From Swiss-Prot:
Phosphorylated by PKA at Ser-15 in vitro, leading to activate kinase activity. Phosphorylation at Ser-15 by CaMK2, leading to increase its activity and promote metaphase II exit during egg activation. It comes from Mus musculus (Mouse). Keywords: ATP-binding, Coiled coil, Cytoplasm, Kinase, Magnesium, Meiosis, Metal-binding, Nucleotide-binding, Nucleus, Phosphoprotein, Transferase, Tyrosine-protein kinase. Changing L316A: Abolishes the cytoplasmic localization. ATP binds at I214, G215, V216, G217, E218, F219, G220, T221, V222, K237. Changing S15D: Mimicks phosphorylation state, lesading to enhance kinase activity and promote pronuclear formation. This is Wee1-like protein kinase 2. One of its GO terms (cellular component) is plasma membrane.
Length: 555
């Protein structure tokens, strides 16, 4: 009887969610059992106060499970194949090709429910209790399933991250550990719902002071904010879609890409991201000059446009940013004026001297205006692309035809049309005959005359054949964009020639010194010998030793 009382009390402590079982067990208890239960009641109340709110009941659990069964299955993770025949012109809308379901669920949730054990009952408890209990294999797999896998990190890096000290395994490994273990993992809670449950208090209101709304785009709304701790201004972007409504990892590509890219002078800097109120929040660098599109609109209103020197400056700086992105194994795929941002350097900023410049990008650190690439929502990997079409006005034809062999050249095509718009070209067509006319290599009409070299470079950037377009690295070292590069090369050749002459003179001087050194040593020795012999001869004639003189005189 004592063992029965202990087991019943333990089961009552471990499973609060099964209220019906507790009611039935209380109805079958004897008077002695009731007395034992009453003696254990204060301990139960204390545990409830320490552990927080009671988890959902069985009815609520059944409702949530049935909802998960109705959610989409593994088809969510497969890319939708295009139509049998590639379109000849883009459609009017620029929506994603991939389906966007309203309810999200991992593929494993579509399978049957396994038997619920005591360990699974413990997993439904609060996170505070889980930290106080020993971690089991199920807990480790649960926490692993809640970790996002960044598609832009190398496979070896991900394995090193997840196999630290041989304790953590990749998802592929977990799927191959057998049917029994896979069944236990199949009914794990969805990653996104867990992130919502563990969401902290409003970080946005706690850490930032909102100044104004500065932009609204496809991703969401951007606010200008001051961080309360450091007093600096940041651009806080809040997603329009709810986090639970995001269809797939493409919606998180901006976070993934920013996290991998790191810091570059010509890419908008990324600081942090988090989930708040079921929306993705991204903390980025604030560019005080706004977007290039806003500057173009102001120029159009005043019947003024960027002149060739400024156009070259924009093209060169964005080429440096694209070169960095492409060298990182990614492409942007949505280059356009609204995704290029301007930073005006403050007067208090000190310029960087030549001795501090470590790369070609540092040449512009002392420039008064910096141009940066932002909005990496369409970024994808070059080796394993998952392409989502950007703005059709700047879209290369090969992307429309789903030819992804030369993805970096699609960014070059879009950059060429971006410079055309900045130079004064009218609004680019979304589709139709004019759209195809530009894709045949015809540069849009502009209201100003450009030099032949620069115009030829821009026209080559929108060449119909992707292979014929220059790379971002080639643009970054183009003599057309570097007006002083030819003169610099000439001065560098003269400097190298003078260095060669100086080195030759040094070698000849060293050789001459080496020849003169033995002669000086011979003359010095001869002088010392002659001086010593002369001293002996003179001393012998003039004066005898004092002891000998005294001895002679005494005799």
């Amino acid at each position: 009887m004592a063992d029965t009382e202990t087991d019943q009390g333990l089961n009552k402590k471990l499973s609060f969610s099964f209220c019906e079982e507790d009611t039935e067990s209380e109805g079958q208890m004897t008077a002695q059992d009731i007395g034992g239960a009453q003696s254990q009641k204060p301990g139960r109340e204390e545990s409830e106060e320490l552990e927080g709110p009671v988890p959902p009941t069985r009815d609520e659990l059944h409702t949530s499970l049935s909802r998960d069964k109705e959610s989409p299955g593994p088809d969510l993770w497969k890319s939708v194949s295009g139509p049998p025949k590639c379109p000849e012109t883009p459609v009017l809308h620029s929506k994603s090709k991939l389906p966007v379901p309203t309810n999200f669920s991992t593929p494993k949730n579509s399978l049957g429910q396994p038997e619920i054990s005591l360990l699974e009952k413990l997993s439904s408890r609060s996170s505070r209790h889980m930290r106080l209990t020993p971690a089991s294999l199920m807990d480790e797999k649960t926490s692993l399933s809640l970790v996002n896998i960044n598609p832009f990190t190398p496979e070896t890096y991900r394995k090193l991250l997840l196999q630290s000290k041989g304790k953590r395994k990749t998802r592929d490994y977990l799927e191959e550990t057998g049917e029994e273990e896979s069944k236990s993992v199949q009914w794990l809670p969805a990653k996104r719902s867990i992130l919502q449950e563990t969401n902290m208090a409003s970080r946005y209101e706690k850490e930032f002071f909102e100044i104004e709304k500065i932009g609204v785009g496809e991703f969401g709304t951007v606010y200008k904010c001051i961080k309360r701790l450091d007093g600096c201004i940041y651009a806080i972007k809040r997603s329009a879609k709810s986090f639970s409504g995001l269809s797939n990892e493409l919606d998180l590509h901006e976070v993934y890409a920013h996290a991998v890219l790191g810091h570059h002078p010509h890419v908008v800097r990324y600081y942090s991201s988090w989930i708040e109120d079921d929306h993705v929040v991204i903390q980025n660098e604030y560019c005080n000059g706004g977007s290039l599109q806003a500057a173009i609109s102001e120029n159009t209103a005043s019947n003024n446009h960027f002149q060739e020197p400024k156009l070259k400056d924009i093209l060169l700086q964005i080429s440096l940013g694209l070169k960095y992105i492409h060298n990182s194994g990614m492409v942007h795929l949505d280059i356009k004026p609204s995704n290029i941002f301007i930073c005006h350097k403050m007067q208090c900023d000190s310029p960087v001297g030549p001795e501090e410049a470590e790369s070609e990008a540092d040449w512009f650190l002392n420039a008064s205006v910096m141009y940066k690439i932002g909005d990496l929502g369409h970024a994808t990997s070059i080796s394993k692309p998952k392409v989502e079409e950007g703005d059709t006005r700047f879209l290369a034809n090969e992307i429309l035809q789903e030819n992804y062999q030369h993805l970096p050249k699609a960014d070059i095509f879009a950059l060429g049309l971006t410079i055309a718009v900045a130079a004064g070209a009218e609004s680019l067509p979304i589709n139709g005959d004019m759209w195809h006319h530009i894709r045949k290599g015809n540069f849009p009409e502009i209201s100003q005359e450009l030099s032949d070299d620069f115009y030829g470079l821009l026209k080559n950037m929108i060449h119909p054949a992707p292979k014929e377009r220059p790379s971002a690295a080639a643009l970054a070292r183009s003599r057309i964009l570097w007006p002083f590069l030819e003169k610099t090369d000439e001065l560098q050749k003269q400097l190298n020639l003078e260095k060669s002459k100086t080195a030759t003179l040094k070698r000849e001087l060293k050789k001459a010194r080496h020849i003169q050194t033995p002669q000086r040593e011979v003359h010095h020795c001869y002088y010392q010998i002659c001086k010593g012999s002369r001293h002996l001869l003179v001393g012998g004639r003039r004066k005898a030793p004092s002891s000998f003189t005294r001895g002679t005189s005494s005799v």
